[in-house]
Amino acid sequence: MNPPQARVSEQTKDLLSVMVNQHPEEDAKVCKSSDNSPLYNTMVMLSYGGDTDLLLSSACTRTSTVNRSAFTQHSVFYIISTVLIQPICCIFFFFYYKATRCMLLFTAGLLLTILHHFRLIIMLLCVYRNIRSDLLPLSTSQQLLLGIIVVTRTMLFCITAYYTLFIDTRVFFLITGHLQSEVIFPDSVSKILPVSWGPSPAVLLVMAAVIYAMDCLVDTVSFIGPRVWVRVMLKTSISF
């Protein structure tokens, strides 16, 4: 049952008016005004509980759909990156390997993609274990470990891509036409639909390398950026 509506005495109104208004000349006007009665009644109700008590437990409150947690754009991008972007880039790296027998970028992309999934598994296990133990989702040491994995993955791929695109001359000769390559389509596709043309494996390699590098950079910034901002601006750390 809801508690009865409290009647506020004149002395209580005078006391509350001092709390609300710091100017003594306006206190009398505020106390005599009937428009402020709902405000006074609400403040008194808050002092001992009731339907408007701000200290109610979460079990007794109703959270609107606007304030409920939901998938963010980063969550959707992370899923698309893990399921689509990285595997497709690795396929293009494999096409370049089949055309030139240069397996450096293909090996690096494959291993770093596996490392990305390994990091995801570690994060899920840490969150599950901490929540089961009634702790915060991620401790400081766990966030540090995940951050090292993210930064290392980005640095290794950027170094490998830089060597393949700018130091190894095969990509340049393939793009300019000085070095011919085989058709990159698999034999199974060629048997069903004979194909004698296709995009250059070097062009696909450049596109895939740029997309994969951007994916790594976005992943690093989205993981490191919020934590650095909270540490610098709020002098604290986040636990997820």
Swiss-Prot record:
Transmembrane segments: 76-96, 104-124, 147-167, 203-225
Domain of life: Viruses
UniProt record, GO biological process: viral life cycle
InterPro entries recorded: Herpes_UL20
Pfam families per UniProt: Herpes_UL20
Coiled coil segments of this chain: none
Keywords linked to the UniProt accession: Host cell membrane, Host endosome, Host Golgi apparatus, Host membrane, Host nucleus, Membrane, Transmembrane, Transmembrane helix, Virion
Subcellular location: Virion; Host cell membrane; Host endosome membrane; Host Golgi apparatus membrane
UniProt topology in membrane: Multi-pass membrane protein
One GO CC annotation: host cell Golgi membrane
Family: Belongs to the alphaherpesvirinae UL20 family.
Chain's role: Plays an essential role in egress of virus particles from the nucleus, cytoplasmic envelopment and virus-induced cell fusion. Forms a functional protein complex with gK and this interaction is absolutely essential for their coordinate intracellular transport, gK glycosylation, expression on host cell surface, and function. Together, they modulate gB-mediated virus-induced cell fusion and virion egress and therefore actively participate in these processes. In addition, plays a role in inhibiting the type I interferon responses by suppressing STING1-mediated activation of the IFN-beta promoter.
Oligomeric and partner information: Interacts with gK (via N-terminus); this interaction plays a role in the coordinate transport of UL20 and gK to the trans-Golgi network (TGN), and is required for their cell surface expression. Interacts with gB. Interacts with host STING1; this interaction inhibits host interferon-beta promoter activation.
Descriptive protein name: Protein UL20 homolog
Species name: Varicella-zoster virus (strain Dumas) (HHV-3)
Gene name tied to this protein: 39
